[in-house]
């Protein structure tokens, strides 16, 4: 059977937490990811593979990406502000430098090889910082409320306005505004070169960006995995991963942006 055929489900890598965790009698440092992430990929037609933080060297991220058709940078703790030249705000999480370095290497490698990827919440911030942008470390000081960070493990609901052009607007077509689930206290401040904003909140908070040089390189500030009835963004990633794999098998070249 042709392993490059369209009947083969795309393999999507998802980054994970690496935190102290409890299960049964055990209280250990462990890699984990809420099941809603890989459930969404499975329901969208992909195979989910988990990618816990690894020691980063010049080749390890590339070898991992060799085995993937697509990538998701998932939600989690704040990016270390040292990565964008700032001291930590009082509310900023203690740094997870292993995860920061791992996800930076993965997302940089994905962009270099045109591997379709999707950043979610922290994933949007990782992308912006990896490409040279900065973050607002405590959004309530900017917008004057905790509308995006209710706390207590409760997602807040916010309306975002979707742009007219781009991959995200194309996937969410006929949806000029969207009620989304939010859980973040940071946001993009200075947008990195090579990224385009494709969704915002009414207070100006950037809610979606795309990599200009890619056929499918998107990130959103909200948590689409929390809406099990709307798989459009996950289906878009799975479809792009399948198309990219088929293009590579047929021509040796990855999927290109429509304008390329």
Where are these regions (language model features)?
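N-terminal beta1-alpha1 cap of cysteine-dependent amidohydrolase-like domains
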Residues: 1-118, 128-129, 136, 140-172, ...
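Conserved G/P- and acidic residue-centered "switch" motifs that form tight phosphate/ATP-binding loops
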Residues: 121
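Hydrophobic, aromatic-enriched interface-forming segments
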Residues: 124-126
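Active-site-proximal beta-strand elements of phosphoester/diester hydrolases
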Residues: 218-221
């Amino acid at each position: 059977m042709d392993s490059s055929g369209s009947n083969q489900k795309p393999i999507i890598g998802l980054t994970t937490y690496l935190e102290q965790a409890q299960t049964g009698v055990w209280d250990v440092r462990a890699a984990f990811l809420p099941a809603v992430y890989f459930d969404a990929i499975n329901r969208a037609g992909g195979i989910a593979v988990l990618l816990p933080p690894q020691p980063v060297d010049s080749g390890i991220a590339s070898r991992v990406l060799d085995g993937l058709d697509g990538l998701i940078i998932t939600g989690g703790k704040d990016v270390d502000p040292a990565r964008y030249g700032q001291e930590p705000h009082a509310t900023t999480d203690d740094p997870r430098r292993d995860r920061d370095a791992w996800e930076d290497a993965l997302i940089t490698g994905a962009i270099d090889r045109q591997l379709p990827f999707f950043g979610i919440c922290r994933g949007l911030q990782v992308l912006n910082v990896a490409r040279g942008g900065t973050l607002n470390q405590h959004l309530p000081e900017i917008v004057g409320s905790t509308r995006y960070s209710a706390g207590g493990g409760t997602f807040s609901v916010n309306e975002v306005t979707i742009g007219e052009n781009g991959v995200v607007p194309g996937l969410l077509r006929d949806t000029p505004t969207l009620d989304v689930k939010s859980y973040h206290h940071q946001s993009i401040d200075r947008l990195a070169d090579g990224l385009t904003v494709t969704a915002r909140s009414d207070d100006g908070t950037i809610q979606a960006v795309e990599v200009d040089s890619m056929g499918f390189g998107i990130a959103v500030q909200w948590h689409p995995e929390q809406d099990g009835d709307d798989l459009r963004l996950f289906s878009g990633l799975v479809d792009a991963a399948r198309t990219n794999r088929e293009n590579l098998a047929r021509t040796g070249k990855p999927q290109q942006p429509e304008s390329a």
